[in-house]
Amino acid sequence: MHTGFGEKFGIPRQSGLVPEATGQIVFEPKYRNPDALRGIEEFTHLWIIWGFSENRVEKFTPLVTPPRLGGREKRGVFATRSPFRPNGMGLSSVRLDRVEYKSSKGPIIYVSGVDMLDGTPIYDIKPYLAYADSHPQASDGFAAEHRWDTVHVIWRDEALKSRMDEDTRIAVEHILAQDPRAAYNKAKDYIYGMRYGSFDIRFVADSHAGTIEIVDVVECIDGYHKVK
């Protein structure tokens, strides 16, 4: 999976929270037969089964601290969506935008609403079936009692917006609106950094005012800041 998230910080906590966060699924050579995708474009959404490739779980930990609970309360790992799991597998529901068949790398599936790091291994793809997979009356457990409110994103200098294309700008604004900071680490005067696509975004946050202010945007090329 190729996404704009080159590091863990900033990745949405769940799939679908940021529809503008896009990704491309590129297959290994042995799976590039277009016949394997025949009929997939009849569906609007897909289930993606993938691996937390950057997590190193050396021993089984039965209790974890969900972000929804502010990093203070513990829940059983199987009662949460913690990335630190015994089998290291993730499950995401994404929107199917289109399929490109004429690529030199074989078929490429373009999706949106991703919550995965760039380079994440994909183990399987299945169509999302609303009649079977949607449960409107389902209980959200502790997640329903501890809502994760979005914050208002502002720009310190309007000229910073011109440093990125509109699609990237909108994606960045919506990613930051989810407040990527850890619940236990929300220092008001700290300057945070987030990498998305080829851009390094710096911002400060005010939890009391419910705002995140973008203070700088620097384009990076091959890991180096581009000189303006």
Placement of each model-derived feature along the sequence:
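Arg/Lys-rich, positively charged N-terminal/basic patches that mediate binding to nucleic acids
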Residues: M1-P34, I40-E42, A130-H174, A183, ...
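Residue-level recognition of beta-strand microenvironments
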Residues: G4, V99-K102, V114, I125, ...
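Short, conserved beta-turn/loop elements at beta-strand boundaries and strand-helix junctions
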Residues: G6, R98-I109, H208
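Glycine-rich, pocket-lining loop/helix-strand segments that form or immediately flank
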Residues: W50-F78
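Flexible glycine-rich active-site/ligand-binding loops centered on an Asp-His dyad
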Residues: I109-A143
